Amino acid sequence: KELVADDEGRLRLKRFAGFEALIASTLDPQQLVPLQAILGNPSASAVATPGVCHMACEGGMEIFLLQGEYDDFLLSGDMYLEGKGKCGLVLRVNDQGDGYFLSLDFYKGLAQLRAWGHNPEGGHEGAFHYQPLQTANFLPTPEPHRFSLLAHGQYLELSLNDFVVLTLADDQFTQGRIGFYAEGAKLRVEGLTLNTYTTPTSPDYPETLAGL
């Protein structure tokens, strides 16, 4: 990461510029749609055109996945939230919803990353494995909320409005689908882009993450 000063003189973190050299391809937005809702919530709906996604779930929660499976990538776009419901991103998830869940509270300025998976031996009470990984605060700003979600090997990073908010290393999920979730909310994403990265091959990985 790189330490810079924002417009008000506050020190902020920006993504390591070296990631630009690792981009392997930029996907055509048409390859990312249509969206797939995987929880079967009857109150959920989604309409997507290349680069723009409209998602809604009036009651309960729904996960909306983009097309394709990815391991190392950078997903970017502008997010708009209608109402006071909850929303966020999911990454490296399977069709059952096991993977990483990133909740975003744009009103309180709170980002939370969790690992979420089914626990077949947990019975009714412990049917899901739920592990908080990291919580971070950020400065609430007016819309649009510009986001960039990066996954490279074990390294995961979220930037909002061009500044790094959350960063950690975790190896529970290494590949899967990417998307969004809405819970009692309407969500719109514009300018959606997806870059894929070359896979880490260094024998020192993930120790090399210390320099990012």
Language-model features, listed with the residues they occupy:
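Extracellular glycan-recognition regions
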Residues: 1-212
